[in-house]
C-alpha cells in the first residue's frame, strides 16, 4: 500500500503548473546525482508534489543563503503562493564524508538533506510557513522508508 501524504483540502500554495519533482545538476558528483535520482523516483511514487519543485544539485561544497549564511541544502519558499519553489543541495564535498564513512552512509546524508528540504516544501504547500519543528524526525522517517525498498542508495 502506498503511503501518500494527504494534503489539506485548502492548500496555501497554488498548483498552477504541472506538479512533480525535477532534478537538475549535470555538474554534480555522478554518485550523488544517481542516488538522488533513484530516491526521487521512489519519492514520486510515495508522496504527492502538487506544485513543481526543481532540485538543483550544486557542484560547490556549500551554498550561500539569501541571508548570507552557508548551508549544505536550502529550500526557497516564495512569498506568493503562485511562484515556484526550489531546493538547492551542495554536492561538492562528497569526497570528504566518503573518506570517513562508507559510500552508503555518505550518500544517505545527501538523501536526508533532500528529505529535510522536502518536508519544508510540504509545510509551505500546506500553510505558507516553514518551521524546523519535527522536520528532522519526518525526514529521517522518509529516508528509513526508502532504505526498506533498496539495498544501496
Each model region followed by its residue ranges:
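Zn2+-dependent metallopeptidase catalytic core
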Residues: 32-52
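Acidic helix-start/capping segments at beta-turn-to-alpha-helix junctions
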Residues: 57-64
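Active-site scaffold of zinc-dependent metalloenzymes
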Residues: 65-107, 121
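Alpha-helical scaffolds flanking conserved acidic
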Residues: 107-111, 133
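Post-HExxH zinc-binding segment in Zn-dependent metallohydrolases
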Residues: 130-153
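Active-site recognition of the HExxH zinc-binding catalytic motif
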Residues: 112-125
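Short, polar/charged, Gly/Pro-enriched helix-capping and turn/loop motifs at alpha-helix termini
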Residues: 50, 125, 149-153
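Pan-zinc metallopeptidase signature
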Residues: 1-22, 26-31
Amino acid at each position: 500500500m502506498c503511503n501518500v501524504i494527504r494534503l489539506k483540502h485548502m492548500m496555501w500554495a497554488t498548483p498552477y503548473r504541472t506538479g512533480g519533482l525535477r532534478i537538475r545538476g549535470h555538474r554534480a558528483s555522478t554518485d550523488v546525482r544517481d542516488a538522488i535520482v533513484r530516491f526521487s523516483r521512489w519519492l514520486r511514487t510515495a508522496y504527492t508534489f502538487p506544485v513543481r519543485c526543481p532540485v538543483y544539485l550544486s557542484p560547490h561544497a556549500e551554498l550561500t543563503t539569501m541571508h548570507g549564511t552557508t548551508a549544505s541544502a536550502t529550500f526557497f519558499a516564495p512569498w506568493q503562493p503562485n511562484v515556484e519553489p526550489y531546493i538547492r543541495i551542495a554536492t561538492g564535498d562528497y569526497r570528504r564524508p566518503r573518506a570517513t564513512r562508507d559510500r552508503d552512509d555518505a550518500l544517505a546524508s545527501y538523501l536526508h538533506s533532500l528529505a529535510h528540504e522536502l518536508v519544508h516544501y510540504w509545510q509551505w504547500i500546506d500553510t505558507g510557513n516553514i518551521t524546523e519543528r519535527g522536520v528532522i524526525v519526518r525526514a529521517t522517517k522518509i529516508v528509513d522508508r526508502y532504505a526498506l525498498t533498496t539495498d544501496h542508495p
